[in-house]
């Protein structure tokens, strides 16, 4: 009976005309033991009251905010989130069997099951309907204070309410749901749930949220998951929608063709992309790699040179140009019958020609082992002991 008394006391506390956030907190603290006590935890009225307290406390927070008072954004948002949970419990428990005059359960002729009625559901539903959009607002507020879990849950509650069929007032346009799912995906990514984020971004796109960021975030998440095929598939969808406005999509597709040895397909796609954007250094470098794979590095050199002309900080482009001269010097050395100083006079100028490109590439990307080995060889052959010692000291 003690917990029944707690429920009654909490109900009386919130029936006062002048209430504050602290009043609602106190009322909920009075009620809280009843949510777990066997006497009261299986009663719909217990949970309906808990829901009402949380929603009205949320409203009081909002009133305070609107008149310029400082409010606890996180506590405000979680009051609404808790109200959803308590409301669902109330609705689940709010079934009263209809009895006949003899006290026996009445049977529904259509279903053959006992007839039931509800006592609290109407009020619970009405409160939620009135606050449906507040869940979307609360999600944004919680996100802004970096409460990723809270934002995720508030947006999930919003979408779950929109999917209910027990009241036509829940209906929300699909495009709004899609946008909310996108933001929920961002929250999932922020809290480290990358798999959930990928699914939510997909749901957003399927619902009509086809903004570029819905593809870009998903690509990033798929990459983090090492889902190579997923990245390629989504890049294809993004390329079909956005074309070469963002070269990252076509680069992914071209690299995939190259990795699978489908050079003709890679070439065709590259030519299409370069025709649209001939000042993209990475496309020029990729074109060179494809041409080299199909033919030789001599035919690829114009593309590598164009790449570093457009962007002298393109490490791969610098490496490829330097690699051309380094390989040329190595071949000359292998094929020549000269020895000693005469051989050095023949090949060292070509090694020297390779050096600035390779050093530039190394300064940008020192993790390229092939590049480091080439520099080590050149420094040795040119007698540059200090540079050789420096690069020898680098650990793999």
Task: Please annotate each region the language model reported.
Residues 39-41, 95, 163, 209, ...:
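Short coil turns that delineate tetratricopeptide repeat
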Residues 29, 33-36, 92, 160, ...:
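Conserved structural position within tetratricopeptide repeats
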């Amino acid at each position: 009976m003690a917990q029944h008394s707690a429920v009654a006391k909490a109900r009386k506390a919130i029936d006062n005309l002048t209430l504050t956030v602290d009043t609602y907190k106190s009322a909920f603290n009075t009620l809280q033991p009843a949510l777990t006590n066997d006497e009261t935890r299986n009663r719909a009225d217990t949970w309906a009251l808990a829901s009402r307290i949380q929603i009205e406390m949320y409203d009081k927070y909002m009133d305070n905010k609107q008149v310029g008072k400082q409010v606890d954004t996180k506590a405000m948002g979680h009051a609404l989130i808790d109200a959803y949970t308590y409301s669902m419990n109330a609705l689940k428990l709010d079934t009263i069997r209809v009895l006949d005059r003899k006290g026996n359960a009445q049977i529904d002729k259509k279903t053959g099951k006992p007839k039931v009625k509800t006592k609290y559901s109407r009020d619970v539903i009405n409160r939620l309907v009135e606050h449906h959009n507040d869940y979307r607002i609360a999600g944004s507020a919680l996100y802004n204070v970096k409460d990723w879990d809270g934002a995720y849950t508030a947006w999930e509650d919003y979408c779950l309410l929109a999917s209910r069929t027990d009241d036509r007032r829940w209906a929300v346009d699909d495009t709004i749901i899609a946008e909310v799912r996108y933001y929920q995906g961002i929250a999932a990514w922020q809290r480290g749930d990358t798999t959930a984020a990928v699914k939510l971004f997909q749901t957003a796109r399927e619902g009509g949220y086809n903004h570029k960021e819905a593809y870009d975030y998903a690509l990033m998440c798929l990459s983090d998951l090492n889902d190579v095929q997923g990245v390629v598939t989504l890049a294809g969808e993004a390329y079909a929608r956005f074309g070469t406005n963002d070269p990252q999509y076509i680069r992914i597709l071209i690299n995939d063709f190259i990795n699978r040895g489908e050079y003709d397909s890679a070439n065709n796609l590259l030519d299409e992309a370069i025709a649209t954007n001939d000042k993209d250094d990475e496309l020029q470098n990729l074109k060179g790699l494809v041409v080299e794979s199909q033919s030789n590095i001599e035919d690829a050199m114009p593309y590598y040179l164009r790449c570093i002309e457009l962007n002298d900080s393109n490490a791969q482009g610098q490496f490829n140009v330097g690699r051309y001269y380094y390989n040329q010097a190595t071949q000359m050395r292998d094929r020549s019958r000269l020895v000693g100083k005469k051989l050095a006079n023949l090949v060292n100028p070509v090694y020297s020609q390779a050096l600035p490109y390779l050093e530039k590439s190394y300064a940008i990307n020192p993790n390229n082992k092939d590049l480091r080995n080439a520099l080590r060889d050149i420094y040795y052959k040119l007698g540059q002991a200090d540079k050789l010692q420096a690069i020898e000291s680098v650990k793999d």
